[in-house]
């Protein structure tokens, strides 16, 4: 799914844009993704799990997502740097077509700049235009207080908990929470 770019200001005054990634962005998107998953335990992968992903494969993935009517991926670009991404995946089956999944990732150096809020506002706006959509869903890992605060600010509420759903490298287990925002 393609949408028009959305320009906004960060809290520190810098200009940013949320836009669909182009195939030419693949290398920087891949670098950003690998960096983000290495900066936190609150995402579902480690950098070494993505080492085999090539720039060419990432470019194909970006193109496929952009062409899909049921997926939207946006990157946040700040002064030529891809600072994060967000996505929404609409279910197309009859029984689950009223649901969509949403996710975000932001480089640590860009935290507390309003990017997450801008991403969620954009994704919610897109979701509101989707006929028949009744709820947005996301998951977060226990301990992600910053993420949880953002999600709650955007109208999401916890509806379920999967005990010990995530096992970290140190062997510790964390619960995973499901949140829903009714449309």
Label each PLM-derived region with a short phrase:
Residues 12, 31-48, 65:
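Helix-loop element at the rim of GNAT/NAT acetyltransferase active sites that forms part
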Residues 1-14, 170-183:
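Terminal substrate-recognition subdomain of acyl/acetyltransferases
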């Amino acid at each position: 799914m393609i949408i028009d770019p959305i320009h906004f200001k960060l809290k520190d005054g810098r200009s940013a844009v949320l836009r669909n990634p182009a195939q030419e962005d693949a290398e920087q998107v891949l670098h950003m993704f690998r960096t983000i998953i290495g900066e936190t335990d609150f995402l579902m992968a480690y950098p070494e799990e993505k080492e085999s992903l090539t720039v060419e494969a990432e470019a194909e993935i970006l193109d496929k997502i952009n062409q899909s009517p049921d997926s939207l991926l946006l990157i946040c670009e700040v002064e030529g740097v891809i600072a994060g991404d967000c996505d929404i995946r609409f279910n197309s089956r009859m029984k689950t077509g009223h649901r969509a999944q949403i996710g975000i990732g932001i480089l640590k150096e860009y935290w507390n700049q309003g990017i997450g809020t801008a991403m969620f506002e954009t994704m919610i706006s897109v979701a509101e235009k989707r006929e028949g959509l009744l709820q947005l869903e996301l998951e977060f890992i226990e301990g992600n207080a910053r993420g949880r605060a953002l999600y709650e600010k955007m109208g999401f509420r916890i509806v379920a908990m999967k005990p010990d759903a995530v096992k970290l490298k140190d062997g510790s287990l964390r619960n995973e929470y499901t949140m829903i925002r009714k449309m």
